[in-house]
């Protein structure tokens, strides 16, 4: 068992989080393994987690086996490069005299855009609407739909915060645009 230092990191605005206190998210790092990162979403429907390993491409996911189930699936994935078949670019060189390749342009303009500056985390407010079919799939309730949205945002924010320096947060009244009724369906 690996202990983690965990802190609350809600995907909901403070007002929306106060309306739905049983739906939240957490982030954490390994106490004895600081290279391990954790993202966890919690709701009455259950928990979902992602643990990033020693390399950013090593991931363990813990998910409910199915909607309404108390069984969980643990999936560990590791991306392994195939050294037997190394990558070889088959794109032909430009045939136009004086044309520059993308590699030439990038080399000339070193680091035009930094993908993520670890010291800056930009927060974007997100208003996310879903159809009644989406809500039906997750139990037909507002809480079930918001719990599913929270699970998705937990995974997205894990990637976006690491790679882009961006965090998405649901707006205050996002519950008003989650459609749980088949009629009238605005879609």
Regions found by a protein language model. Give the residues of each.
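Fold-level signature of zinc-dependent metallopeptidase catalytic domains
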Residues: 71-187
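N-terminal prosegments of processed precursors
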Residues: 1-67
């Amino acid at each position: 068992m690996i202990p983690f230092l965990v802190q609350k990191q809600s995907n909901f605005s403070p007002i929306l989080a106060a309306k739905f206190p049983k739906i939240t998210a957490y982030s954490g790092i390994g106490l004895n393994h600081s290279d391990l990162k954790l993202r966890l979403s919690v709701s009455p429907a259950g928990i979902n987690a992602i643990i990033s390993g020693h390399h950013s491409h090593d991931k363990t996911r813990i998910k409910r086996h199915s909607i309404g189930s108390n069984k969980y699936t643990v999936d560990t994935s590791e991306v392994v490069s195939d050294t037997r078949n190394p990558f070889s670019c088959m794109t032909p060189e430009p045939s136009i005299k004086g044309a520059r390749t993308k590699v030439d342009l990038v080399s000339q303009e070193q680091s035009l855009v930094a993908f993520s500056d670890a010291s800056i985390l930009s927060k974007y407010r997100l208003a996310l609407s879903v159809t009644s079919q989406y809500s039906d799939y997750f139990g037909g309730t507002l809480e079930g739909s918001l719990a599913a949205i929270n699970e998705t945002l937990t995974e997205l924010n894990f990637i976006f915060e690491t790679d882009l320096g961006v965090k998405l947060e649901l707006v205050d009244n996002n519950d008003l645009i989650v459609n749980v009724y088949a009629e009238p369906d605005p879609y």
